[in-house]
């Protein structure tokens, strides 16, 4: 949609480079927006903008999507945070993609930032997740045995006319052969640059941890698809207050506890990557209940005004502001 701006970083070696890149580019976007009497926010769904009033970007690609899919595309007034992490081979990318699926609810819980849609409090922490699942090639990735099976699947989708390229496969996590990466796409857009960097660090640590296990021949733990799907729903609905299933017997664990345990296990990896502080920032957000969707609802509750959410998030994204998640 024309109301959405996509900001891409360059290839970065570490999260400090990501932070610097984002600050520079978002500052540039803000400057251009301000010159045209506009402001920008980073949010999963705009709290009151009407999707019926938005214009689709006038390019052949997006107009083709609209013609092909109709209503599911027209209501895509949503924004996400996508993170690419480089991996050495297609086989490793498939293994990591399979292993990462169990962490989808953690990523939703940490990033959930869309409790309002079309002026309505939806009852979901991440409304964006359910809207995006309306696309025919979105949602959980299938569990694939190897890279050859992935290639065969892509060829089949092309031959059937379902897609023209991998760019039209909108799984929550996907191998990206053109970039040599695993791309994590499940997160809502989060309000601040620091939160973007924190989540990118968490994702990088997960992927690097899986990569090391793969290199050492250790079997990656994979949950049954029904468990992953149920956990995704629980995080979408309840955010950090969700209880998720941790094994096939139905044993439950609070999502917040699972996130903190996962971060603790990843600290050695974070130390080696130079991003321990970023993971500790996530612990603070979890412990203090400062997740973005909670901040949205708090901003609204002060005066019952949806415009207060937008004003608050405009300020949060200002590059030179220090955000205290209050």
Label each PLM-derived region with a short phrase.
Residues 51-63, 122-136:
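Short, low-order "capping/linker" segments at domain edges
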Residues 59-80, 143:
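Acidic, His- and aromatic-enriched active-site or binding-groove loops in soluble protein domains
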Residues 33-46, 71-78:
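Short, flexible active-site-proximal loops enriched in glycine and acidic residues
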Residues 92, 108-132, 139:
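Glycine-rich, mobile lid/loop segments that gate access to catalytic sites or pores
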Residues 37-54, 118-122:
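Short, glycine/charge-rich beta-strand/loop segments that flank catalytic centers
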Residues 1-36, 65, 71, 132-326:
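C-terminal accessory/tail domains of diverse enzymes
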Residues 83:
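An acidic/histidine-cluster motif and surrounding catalytic segment
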Residues 22, 59-68, 87-108, 191-204:
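Helical (often loop-to-helix) elements that flank the catalytic cores of nucleotide-handling enzymes
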